[in-house]
Amino acid sequence: MFITFEGSEGGGKTSQLAALANYLRQQGIPVVATREPGGTPIGDQIRTVILNLENTAMQPRTEILLLQASRAQLVEQLIRPRLAAGEVVLCDRYADSSLAYQGYGYQQFPLEELKALIGFATGGLKPDLTLLLDVDVEEGLKRRAQGGGWNRLDAYDQAFYQRVRQGYLEMAQAEPGRWVVIDTGRPFELVQAEIRGVVFERLLNR
């Protein structure tokens, strides 16, 4: 089963994914946790280029293509083989991040063009379940500021992240069979409990 975690800044994707992965392992369920961009040696090198604060001259089109290159490597080297082996794959961001950030956020590229490019990079591989960890933009940015570790993709204004959040919500509404929206404006434990419930229901019914 292929499960992706999506959301704007400060939603807690990374920590919630790690907690879920640990819990699944405790239950004896084979699981691999990965992330985008990165997740493979080649992808991690691409990630470094994308996030480097010194690369201020990087154009949006360049960024999109680098993200798809990292994604293509991750799908073929890790995700498909692990799924074929019967493992649960948890991914911190995937194709929907490109649509939310480079599509809805930048507002420079037609969504259909991005979808075609993503389809080529992934070979059409879509998640079985996408968890949208949703948080109010202002609250999310406060959490992000407290976390530190800034990178090039953090240098956007609040209006940009509002568009990203709206894009995520529109995608979730358009494909309710795949998406589940999780309100992360609550204590960590409550959010994790809801995530576990959703995931186990899908695992039992697959």
Region roles according to the model:
Residues 29-122, 194:
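ATP-dependent small-molecule kinase phosphotransfer cores
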Residues 13:
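Conserved lysine of the Walker
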Residues 3-5:
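Hydrophobic anchor at the beta1->P-loop junction of P-loop NTPases
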Residues 19-21, 138-206:
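NTP-dependent small-molecule kinase module
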Residues 96-166:
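A glycine- and Lys/Arg-enriched "phosphate-lid" helix/loop adjacent to the NTP-binding pocket
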Residues 10:
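Walker A (P-loop) phosphate-binding loop of P-loop NTPases
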Residues 16:
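Hydrophobic positions on the alpha1 helix immediately C-terminal to the Walker A/P-loop
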